[in-house]
Amino acid sequence: MIDGEFGGNQDWFTNIVMNIGGCGAATACDSCIYLAKYKGMKELYPFDLEQMDKEAYKKFSQLMKPYIRPRVQGVKKPEWYIGRLEKYISDVNKRCGTDYQIHMEKFDGTGDADEAERIICGQIDKELPVPYLMLRHLNTEKYKDFIWHWFLVVGYEKEKHETWIDVA
């Protein structure tokens, strides 16, 4: 929790570029905070894990910005996100003498829904959040805040023949 919120929010960013297009960096920040707090990879978040607040989160986002920087059309390719987050982790390893290894693999929109559900639910069942880029959705009105947007999938719910994701 960051000042009562689950995860960060790019609306907090005072840097205009990050405020408009920093969802990829915010998702990476949230991922690193989760891994630091719950998976023992404490050096991935260089601030106090017990006293997280918006100011520290904004500072962290500025550290992440050179790795996953906003672009004119956003961080529109998952491999960009993966490669740059791997670079951040590699730099943390070099700087802190750690050896964090995180296997990240792209699953894109060409796969089928059943496979996506299996992958996402499998990661959540392992207590690992899933960075997710939604470029389009058939229901543009209902999901307008998620179109062309990175976010973190942190849970799911199954009801009969449907699975719903919980996001941060």
Label every PLM stretch briefly.
Residues 1-84:
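Active-site-adjacent structural segments surrounding the nucleophilic cysteine of cysteine proteases
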